[in-house]
Amino acid sequence: MKNKVILITAFIGIFFTSCSKFLDQVPDDVLSEEDIFESLVNTRKYLAQVYTNMPDEFSCRFAPSNYAGPYTGASDEANYWSLSWVMSNSLNQSTWDNTAGGTFWINWYKPVRTATDFINKIDGANDAEVDDMIKKHYKGEARAMRAIFYFWMMRLYGPVIILDKEVPVNGTGDEIFFARTPFDECVDYVVGQLDSAYAEITESVQNTSQHADQPLTYSNVVEYGRVTTGVCKAYKLQVLMLAASPQFNGNTQLANLKNQDGTQLVNQTYDAGKWTKAVNAAKEFLEEFDGTTYSLYKETDTDSWVAAYKSCKNVIVTDWNTEWIFGRPMSTTSDYWYDITPKLVGYSSDVAKGAGFLSVNQSMVDAYEMKNGLRITNSLSGYSSSGFSDFKSPYDLKARSTFNQWVNREARFYVGVTYNRSYWQNQAGSTEVIPVFEYSGNSGKVQSSWDVTSTGYIVRKQLATTGYSSRGWVYLRLAQIYLDYAEALNEVDPGNTDILKYVNLIRVRAGLPGYGSGDSDIEAPTTQSTVREVIRHERQIELAFENVRYFDLRRWLIAEETMGANVYGMNVYADGDDFYEKTLTYNRRFLQRDYLWPVPNDEILKDKYLVQNPGW
C-alpha cells in the first residue's frame, strides 16, 4: 500500500461521448481541492479519474501496461508463445514474480482512494453548478466503481485490504498500516457498496428525464461506459459467484493464509448458502433487466447458420448493443488488431497487415462443437480429423478446399478462429486475400521467427471490418449472466428447468439444438455433475477470448489440469499435408501458488501487518 493518499495533483480529462474518446487521457492544470467541486466541469473530471484505471484489454500483449490483463494468453484458450517478453508467457511457465504480479494491487488502489475522497466530498459541491441529481448519481457511480475495482483485485489476489475511509496524507504508524480483510468480509463489503450505489443511482433520477438503467446523457450525448443500475446488479452477481465457487468456498488449500494475528483469511468450511445468494442475485438482475434493458443480440439471414454466425460475431463488435452491460470505449484498438491480423506478406499496400501472434490453442479449436450440436468426440457428429472437402464457411463467398477438422463446425468456431487458407474478412482490391500459415506461406514461419502464429490458428473474435478505429471492449454481457444463473442454480437446485432453459437460449442463438427430449434436441444431461460439465463447456465456447475463461478455471480449481496442460497446434514448420499434423507447440506448467497472484513485495516490506499469498 502507498503510505499516503494524494487527493489530487492533476486531472485526467475524460470526454464522455458515444464515440471513442470516453477515456482519452488529457493532462490538465493542477487544481486545489477547493477548485475541484466548484464547477461541474472539474467535478466531472475528478470522477473521471476513478474510471481512468479501467483496463484497456485491447492492449493485452503489453499487460500490465494500460491496466490490461494477460488473461487470454494465460488461459488454455490461446498464447503469445512467440513473444518471450509477454507477461502471459511467464505465467504459463510459472516463472513470474511478485513485481509483475503486483502491478494491479498498486494501480487499482489509486481509483479506490480517489473514489473514497469523491464520495466524501461531492455533497459539498457548488449547488449552483452541481445539482442534487448529479451529486447523488455521481456518488453512486464512484461507489460502484470502487466496488468493481475491489472485485477485480479479489479475483486476482483473494483477500484484499478494504479501505472504507480516507488514509491521512501525512499519517504514520497504524494510520497507514493495515492487515488484509478476510475474503468473506470483502465480499459483504463489495455487495453492500453495490447495493448502496444501485439505490443512489435509482433515487438520483427520480422526477427527471434520465433513466437509472441507462448511461447518463450529457450535452445530448449518451455517455456509454458509465455505471448504471444494471452494472451494479451484474457485478453484485459476479462477486457472489466468485465467493460461492470452490476457490473461496471451503478451500483447504488456503488453510495457511492467515493474518499475523491468526485471523483466517479464506473460510475453511463449504457453505452451500453462498450459491443461494448467487442465485438470488441472478434472479434480481433477470427480473429487472432481462428483456427490457438488455436482451440477447440477434441478427437475421435467410440461412440460419449464417444468421447465427452474424449474431455471435456482431454481439462483440457492435458497440453498446442490447447485450452489453458494461465495457470501456477506446480511441484505438491497433494493438489487438495487429495481434489477430495475419502477416499477409506479398499483398499490395492496400491490404492491412498484422502479425497474428495471438494464437489459438488446439484444445480450444477442439472444444467447438459441430454444426449439428454434437462434440467432435461423438461418433455421430460427422467430424473427421483428416482429409479435405470443398466447403463454404459462413463468411466466405464460395466453397474452397478445407481441412476436414474445420468443416461443418458450429458458427462460433468461425467467429473465434482464423485457420489456414480461410477467406480473410478484410479484403482489399481485386486480389483475393487468403492467409496461409504453412511454413512457406504468406503468414508462415518463413516470414518471421516470432511475428506469426505459433499454432497455425489466430484469434478472430474481436475482428471488426472497421480496422482499428475507436471501439469498445465489453467487460460483461447478458449471455454471461444467463450462464452464471444456470451454474449457480445447478448447485442449489439440480434439475430445475431454468438451468437448461438459459443454456439453451444461448445455444439456439448460436444456431445449435438445445438440450432436451424433443426430436431436434440434444439428449439432456441428467445428473448434477454432467449438467455442471455442460454449463462449463458452454461458458468456454460462448465467452471465449473475453477474459472470462482464465478466472473460471481458477475459481473452479481446475487450472492445474487445464492451464497447466501442454499446448498443441498445427505443424507450423511444415508445408502441405505435413502442416496438418497435430504438433506440440510448447510445455506449460501451473503451480498451486498460481491460483492467487502475489502481493507486491515492496508493499509487504512497507506494511508491517500485510501478509503474502502462499508460495510467494
Task: Briefly describe each language-model feature range.
Residues 3, 13-39, 190, 486, ...:
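Bacterial Sec-dependent N-terminal signal peptides
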Residues 19, 108-111, 189-191, 220-223, ...:
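Long, intrinsically disordered, low-complexity segments
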Residues 20-84, 139, 160, 164, ...:
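An aromatic- and glycine-enriched ligand-binding surface/loop that stacks and positions planar moieties
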Residues 39, 44-62, 80-158, 173-219, ...:
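Conserved, well-structured interaction surfaces
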Residues 187, 275, 495-496:
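TPR-repeat structural position
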